[in-house]
């Protein structure tokens, strides 16, 4: 049977590494407070890693979610059930019809997941897989959702999925925007939670305000991340217009 082996090697400069990660988490928290109104506590953000992932997987399995089983666990090592190829790989290689189906399935599954009051925390499209015609979720090391309100944690999940989807390699600009718009539409139709939408609108205002002055300078910059940022800002912009 196939499995996924995840290892973390303890660093020689572990104390210094923790200090740097704490400073980074602190800056993230301050930025989140300024722009989105919530302060994710750095100490909670840093309670992540393989042990945290094993705990979350056990909780989600108990709740009946489609996530991998933990087959073996020891310090700095997890052996997980293999739950199919990731959607990033599938979307890159499939035809347009299959891409649309996969995008709809991913958005609808996230909406159903959120409707149960759950959050992922690492909801990039590469962390969704397809097995037996159903969407599964992997990679639960990140702990940001534990220190945000439920609506903001879920809005952040959706942002992660959209941003990663529209930044995929082998998608031209038109296809990327089509898939991103479809994912947003399907999600909001399936989970019309006003609190999540309000958080998404706040996030959209921040992204659009940042994108406006940068666009003339970086419009032709050949970076998937930069162009993906502009695409997701454009996809979310109508939320502001309707508010």
What is each residue range found by the language model?
Residues 1-48:
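ATP-binding glycine-rich loop module of kinase domains
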Residues 2-6, 79, 137:
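Short hydrophobic-acidic sequence motifs that mark active-site Asp/Glu residues
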Residues 8, 83, 141:
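Anionic group-transfer/hydrolysis microenvironments
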Residues 12, 87, 145-147:
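Conserved protein kinase catalytic core
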Residues 50-66, 88-126, 131, 135, ...:
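Conserved kinase catalytic-core helix
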Residues 69-73:
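Short beta-strand
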Residues 75-87:
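Conserved short submotifs of the Hanks-type protein kinase catalytic core
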Residues 140-243:
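C-lobe/activation-segment region of protein kinase-like
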């Amino acid at each position: 049977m196939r499995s996924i082996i995840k290892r973390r090697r303890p660093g020689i400069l572990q104390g210094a590494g923790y200090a740097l990660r704490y400073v980074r988490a602190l800056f993230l928290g301050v930025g989140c407070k300024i722009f989105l109104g919530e302060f994710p506590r750095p100490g909670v953000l840093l309670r992540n890693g393989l042990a945290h992932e094993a705990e979350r997987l056990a909780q989600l399995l108990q709740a009946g979610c489609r996530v991998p089983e933990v087959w073996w666990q020891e310090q700095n090592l997890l052996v997980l059930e293999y739950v199919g190829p990731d959607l990033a790989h599938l979307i890159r290689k499939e035809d347009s019809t299959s891409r649309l189906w996969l995008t709809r399935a991913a958005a609808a599954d996230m909406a159903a997941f959120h409707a149960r009051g759950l959050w992922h925390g690492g909801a990039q499209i590469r962390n969704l897989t397809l097995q037996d015609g159903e969407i599964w979720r992997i990679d639960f090391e990140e702990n940001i959702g534990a220190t945000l309100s439920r609506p903001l944690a879920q809005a952040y999940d959706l942002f992660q999925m959209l941003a990663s989807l529209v930044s995929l390699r082998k998608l031209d600009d038109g296809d990327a925007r089509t898939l991103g718009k479809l994912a947003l539409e399907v999600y909001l139709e399936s989970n019309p939670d006003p609190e999540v939408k309000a958080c998404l609108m706040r996030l959209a205002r921040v992204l659009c305000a940042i994108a406006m002055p940068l666009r003339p300078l970086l419009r032709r910059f050949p970076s998937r991340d930069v162009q993906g940022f502009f695409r997701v800002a454009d996809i979310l912009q109508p939320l502001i217009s309707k508010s």
